[in-house]
Amino acid sequence: LLCCAGIMGGVFAGTISDHLFQSRRGPVAAVLYGLMLVGAVVLTFTYEQPYVGWLMIIMSMAVIGVHGMLSGTASMDFGGTKNVGIAVGIIDGFVYLGTAVMSFTYALVLPGEQLDAAGKIVGPATDPANWRPWPLAMIPLAALGLILSTRVWNAKPKGKKA
């Protein structure tokens, strides 16, 4: 399902970039960060509702879509053909740095996994209330991404010379 969400996120990002925002990447990133932000806020208060699965699919689509938009196409746009490698390296480096920071954050705030003799998860990890820090940790980062993506709202890739 995550693979499908990723494919849909990439197609959605590319479609709205090309057809709605005239190939500008900033507005697409802003829309996707906005989806992440709204999703995290809604998830914080409704994490026990049955529609949370669909919300997670939409949020996964936004996360993977913005990653593809920023590390793929935007790096080519802003790095140019001669510097695209360094642009991708810098952007992806920050992606993995952010992933590492969030992994340590989640390890500190989320419940540890405990298994019974049959290998079934038991203990604090089974209580949905103990998972509230997960969307709460996403809110400030999605807001930061939204704010920063609005800074490049009007940036457009340079056309090729004929």
Give the location of each predicted region.
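Multi-pass alpha-helical transporter architecture, strongest
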Residues: 43-47, 131-162
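Transmembrane alpha-helical segments of major facilitator superfamily
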Residues: 1-6, 91-95, 141
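Cytoplasmic membrane-interface "Motif A"-like loop-to-helix N-cap segments
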Residues: 18-33
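Hydrophobic/aromatic and small-residue hotspots that mark the transmembrane alpha-helices
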Residues: 9-18, 106
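A membrane-interface helix-boundary motif in multi-pass transporters
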Residues: 24-27, 106-142
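Intracellular juxtamembrane helix-capping segments at the cytosolic ends
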Residues: 65-80
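C-terminal ends and interior cores of transmembrane alpha-helices
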Residues: 34-48
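A late C-terminal transmembrane helix in Major Facilitator Superfamily
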Residues: 81-115
